[in-house]
Amino acid sequence: MYAIIETGGKQIKVEAGQEIYVEKLGVEADEVVTFDKVLFVGGENVKVGAPFVDGATVTAKVVKEGRAKKIVVFKLKAKKNYRRKQGHRQPYTKLVVEAINA
C-alpha cells in the first residue's frame, strides 16, 4: 500500500517503512508526526481525494533534522565587474513512515 501526501508545498509518494526527507517541520527527534493531507491511497482498493481523502492519515517517526549540502548562488554581469557569491543550505526533516491509515 502506498499514499501520496502533501507537506511543505510538495507532494510525496510514501510507503510504510520508507525513509523520506521533507521540508523542516520543527519537531524533536523520536516524535511521531501525523499527516492528514492525503491526496491518494493506492493498493488493493484505490482512493482518490477531492482534494484530500476523508479519514486517511499517514503517521511517521522523526529520525533527525538537518541541513542539506551547500549550494552556491553566483551572479555575474559581464564586463561590469559585478559579482555576488552566496551560499545556501536548505533545512530538512528526515522521517520514517510507520503506517498508512485509509
From Swiss-Prot:
Keywords (A to Z) from UniProt: Ribonucleoprotein, Ribosomal protein, RNA-binding, rRNA-binding
The keyword Amino-acid biosynthesis is annotated on this UniProt entry: no
InterPro entries: bL21-like, bL21-like_sf, Ribosomal_bL21, Ribosomal_bL21_CS
Keyword Zinc applies: no
Signal peptide: none
SUPFAM superfamilies: L21p-like
Superkingdom assignment: Bacteria
Subunit structure: Part of the 50S ribosomal subunit. Contacts protein L20.
Its biological purpose: This protein binds to 23S rRNA in the presence of protein L20.
Name listed for the protein in its UniProt record: Large ribosomal subunit protein bL21
